[in-house]
UniProtKB/Swiss-Prot annotation:
Belongs to the UPRTase family. It is an enzyme of class 2 (transferase). This is Uracil phosphoribosyltransferase. Coiled coil: none annotated.
Length: 209
C-alpha cells in the first residue's frame, strides 16, 4: 500500500492491544490514546527539516540544530480526534491546533460538517490530521479536502486503526496524503464499524453511549 505507514514498535502494538480490550475503562482508554499518539507523533515528524544554529551553553558556545521551515499544525476531527491532541502537544507544544467537526449521517453514512476553526496561517503550515479510526474514509477525506481548500499543500493523516476500505478511499481521493497508523483491520460491518477494531472511539474516550 503506497504512502501508508504502519508502526510496528512493540510499545505501540502493546498499547493498541489494551485499547482493543472491551474491559479497558474510560480513564485507561484516554491515557492509552494519548500515549500512542505521542509515540506515533515521534515517527510522523521524523522528516521535519532542521537548521544549524549557535547557542551559548553554561560552558561555552555550541553549534546545534533546531526545527526549521514550515511550522506544524494539528487538526483533530471532532470528537474522537481530541483524544490524540495532548500526546502530540507533549512533543510539539508550540504547534497550533485547529478543529474540524464532522459526524457520520446514520442513514447515508456520509460525513456532515458542523464546525471548523483553523489557524489563520494554516496555508503556511504542515498539517497533521488526527482521527483515531479510519473506517470508510469519508470523514477524513472530507476534512482533508476542506483543509486543502484553505491552501494547505502538505498534509498527513494519523490514525490508530485503519480499515482497508478507508485506506482505499483515501488513496483514491488524496493520493498525496500520507497515512500513518498503528494497525490495519480487514473489514467493516453493516454499520461501518471497523472489525475487530476497538468499538466507538469517541464513546470510549468520553464515557458516552
Amino acid at each position: 500500500m503506497e504512502n501508508v505507514f504502519v508502526f510496528d514498535h512493540p510499545l505501540i502494538q502493546h498499547k493498541i492491544s489494551l485499547l482493543r480490550d472491551k474491559n479497558t475503562n474510560t480513564k485507561e482508554f484516554r491515557e492509552l490514546v494519548s500515549e500512542i499518539a505521542m509515540l506515533m507523533g515521534y515517527e510522523v515528524t521524523r522528516n521535519m527539516p532542521l537548521k544549524e544554529v549557535e547557542i551559548e551553553t553554561p560552558i561555552g558556545m555550541a553549534k546545534t540544530k533546531v526545527i526549521s521551515g514550515k511550522k506544524l499544525g494539528i487538526v483533530p476531527i471532532l470528537r474522537a480526534g481530541l483524544g490524540m491532541v495532548d500526546g502530540m502537544l507533549r512533543l510539539i507544544p508550540m504547534a497550533k491546533v485547529g478543529h474540524i467537526g464532522l459526524y457520520r449521517d446514520p442513514e447515508s453514512l456520509q460525513p456532515v460538517e458542523y464546525y471548523c476553526k483553523l489557524p489563520v496561517d494554516v496555508e503556511e503550515r504542515e498539517i497533521v490530521v488526527l482521527d483515531p479510526m479510519l473506517a470508510t474514509g469519508g470523514s477524513a477525506s472530507a476534512a482533508i479536502q476542506f483543509i486543502k481548500n484553505r491552501g494547505v499543500k502538505n498534509i498527513k493523516l494519523m490514525c490508530l486503526i485503519a480499515a482497508k476500505a478507508g485506506i482505499e478511499r483515501m488513496q483514491k481521493d488524496h493520493p498525496d496524503v500520507g497515512i500513518y497508523c498503528a494497525s490495519v483491520d480487514e473489514i467493516l460491518n453493516d454499520h461501518a464499524y471497523i472489525v475487530p477494531g476497538l468499538g466507538d472511539a469517541g464513546d470510549r474516550l468520553f464515557g458516552t453511549k
